[in-house]
Amino acid sequence: MGDEDVSRWRLGAALPEVLGGPEASLMLDHTRKGLMVEGEYIPLDVIFPILHGPFGEDGTVQGLFEVAGLPYVGSGVLASALSMDKVSFKQHMAGAGIDVGKFIGLTGDQWRSDRAHWQERIAALGWPVFVKPSRAGSSQGISKVHGPDVLVAAVEE
């Protein structure tokens, strides 16, 4: 990599070329494992689902592969789905006896119905706290909150 500017590692200008590529369909034929690309069968030994974000990391694509009977590497449907949902993941790990950091999971409706209650519970964790959407990938929507004065804005973002 060296001096290479990683900001150029984006689809950007190549998007029209990629979108204009051949259409591919998964075959739902359990006697053959492969893709149909422009009417031509292409056999597959295994799929490497190198994806990011919704439908890539949340178990959706893995479920599609399983329905189609296509072998793939990496996490399965449940592990992928749990990994995308932070609250469910922490509850699952805690239920298995694995220590997890203190957290509070709440929905938008819960927050709106009794904001003062949730502000007190969150403050009881101690500052700073991190506010993050439960089902957003990577660092999307994350805020480091140092006190109650900025908590509301972080939660409602």
PLM region descriptions:
Residues 70, 98, 127:
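Short glycine/serine/threonine/alanine-rich loop segments
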Residues 1, 60, 64-65, 146-157:
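Amphipathic repeat-derived elements
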Residues 1-78, 82-95, 105-120:
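ATP-binding N-terminal substructure of ATP-dependent carboxylate-amine bond-forming enzymes
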